[in-house]
Amino acid sequence: MHIKATVERLPGGMMLVPLLLGAVCHTLWPQAGSTLGSFSNGLISGTVPILAVWFFCMGATIQLRASGRVLRRSGSLVLTKIAMAWLVAVLCAPLLPIGGVPSGPLAGLSVLALVAAMDMTNGGLYAALMQQYGSSEDAGAVVLMSLESGPLISMLILGASGLASFDPLLFVGAVLPLLLGFALGNLDAQLRQFFAQATTTLVPFFGFALGNTLDLSTIAHTGASGVLLGVAVIVITGLPLLLADRWIGGGNGTAGVAASSTAGAAVATPALIAGMAPQFAPAAPAATALVASAVIVTSLLVPLLTALYARRGVARSG
């Protein structure tokens, strides 16, 4: 049986299929974790410890050695993505209930969902697109994109926009596993290679644990708004990223288009934020479902838009 190959045909499948399976389990048997206990409960409810290990391993993949040009390219994209997420948070905070829109075509939409979907780029998708349509320097920009992994950037955006106040120690706790992994990965290349293997292995596990916080009715309730959110991520972040790549990064804009996606890891952000800022707890389940939809939508549309833009540039230069 070719289960892995089949799952990977769906964009973000290694995250989203286990997430859906977890949601099915939670819908049919909400008390499964507490009833089974022990290791089964850890697998069902262990989102935070599983993600802690994943953040550590992600940190180990970030290499300190990078040319100034690569840092300029990646820095311009990362800072632009974060700036747009912050701007959206500031503009939408007075318009959206903190617990999310209760019904209608925007059902479940909240500032938490917007920030989580917009502040983290799908680094794997970006690197793959740049290997095909960009240069080695473009692909190398994924170096700084790894820093977006985890809830830290979302915490900073929500704090800077006045929507939340976090204890400084929570910021330290959020970034410490990433920094420890970063330190070890740069001290020993063999350790970097060793830990890097786990970054993909752990994805279905935290996807399943996250799914066990969702109900299928929540996913169905937010279906249309999830598609709209995915399109909004591309529209709102895509043009600024394109311009930043051209004007600041020194590229032709292709890298900017390729960076206008939502990372699979962003699906975990709402639950993690809600655990640190309880006022977001009512919005977290719907936000998780919305971000999962945005991952699928952007994973489908961004490669098409990147290819169209790159070919248009080739046609013009020719």
UniProtKB/Swiss-Prot annotation:
Membrane topology: Multi-pass membrane protein
Keywords: Cell inner membrane, Cell membrane, Membrane, Sugar transport, Symport, Transmembrane, Transmembrane helix, Transport
Top-level division of the source organism's lineage: Bacteria
Primary localisation category: membrane
Transmembrane segments: 10-30, 42-62, 82-102, 109-129, 139-159, 163-183, 194-214, 224-244, 257-277, 289-309
GO molecular function: 2-keto-3-deoxygluconate:proton symporter activity
Keyword Cell inner membrane included in the entry's annotation: yes
Catalysed conversion reaction: 2-dehydro-3-deoxy-D-gluconate(in) + H(+)(in) = 2-dehydro-3-deoxy-D-gluconate(out) + H(+)(out)
Entry-linked InterPro entries: 2keto-3dGluconate_permease, 2keto-3dGluconate_permease_sub
Compartments where found: Cell inner membrane
Keyword Signal recorded: no
Function field: Catalyzes the proton-dependent uptake of 2-keto-3-deoxygluconate (KDG) into the cell.
Name the UniProt record assigns to this protein: 2-keto-3-deoxygluconate permease
Gene designation per UniProt: kdgT
